[in-house]
């Protein structure tokens, strides 16, 4: 029996590959982190087969590298993700997101009375690890929410 080990998503010469994104989360990451606001080529793989996860999403962004802050902000959506730095088609660095203390300019406060909806301010949430959950506390209204509530917003 032979195995077909072809790449299902084309390799990139230089840039970032975000791998092991839970299935159905890839598009959310693209929009929340404004990854599409670039002139660079972006390749997206959705519902790809994965031995570990069953199915996964994958994002490849050419000639773009994520900051440590951006990598860590992925932890809310894709805690098992691997962020690979690619140079000349080789993986030259790997990192995994770890939960940051704060998340800025990404999420929207679910409190409709929060000042962040009416004023031109950047969103800011403090991240707090709980026993079975992650809580996010808005800097402006000071209300605390389960991360699932904020992510669904």
Curated annotation (Swiss-Prot):
Its cofactor is Zn(2+). The keyword Zinc applies. GO terms for molecular function: metal ion binding. One of its GO terms (cellular component) is aspartate carbamoyltransferase complex. It comes from the Bacteria. Binds 1 zinc ion per subunit. The keyword Metal-binding applies. Keywords: Metal-binding, Pyrimidine biosynthesis, Zinc. It holds the Pfam family PyrI. GO terms for biological process: 'de novo' pyrimidine nucleobase biosynthetic process; pyrimidine nucleotide biosynthetic process. Zn(2+) binds at residues 109, 114, 138, 141. Belongs to the PyrI family. Contains catalytic and regulatory chains. Involved in allosteric regulation of aspartate carbamoyltransferase. This is Aspartate carbamoyltransferase regulatory chain. The gene is pyrI.
């Amino acid at each position: 029996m032979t195995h077909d080990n072809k790449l299902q998503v084309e390799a990139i010469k230089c840039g970032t590959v975000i791998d092991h994104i839970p299935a159905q989360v890839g598009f959310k990451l693209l929009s929340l982190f404004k990854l599409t606001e670039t002139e660079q080529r972006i390749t997206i793989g959705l519902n790809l087969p994965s031995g570990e996860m069953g199915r996964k999403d994958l994002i490849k962004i050419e000639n773009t590298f994520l900051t440590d802050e951006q990598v860590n902000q992925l932890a809310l959506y894709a805690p098992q993700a691997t962020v690979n730095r690619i140079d000349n088609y080789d993986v030259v660095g790997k990192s995994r997101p770890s939960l940051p203390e704060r998340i800025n300019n990404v999420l929207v406060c679910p409190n409709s009375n929060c000042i962040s909806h009416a004023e031109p301010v950047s969103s800011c949430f403090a991240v707090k690890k709980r026993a079975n959950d992650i809580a996010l506390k808005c800097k402006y209204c000071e209300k605390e929410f389960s991360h699932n509530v904020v992510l669904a917003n």
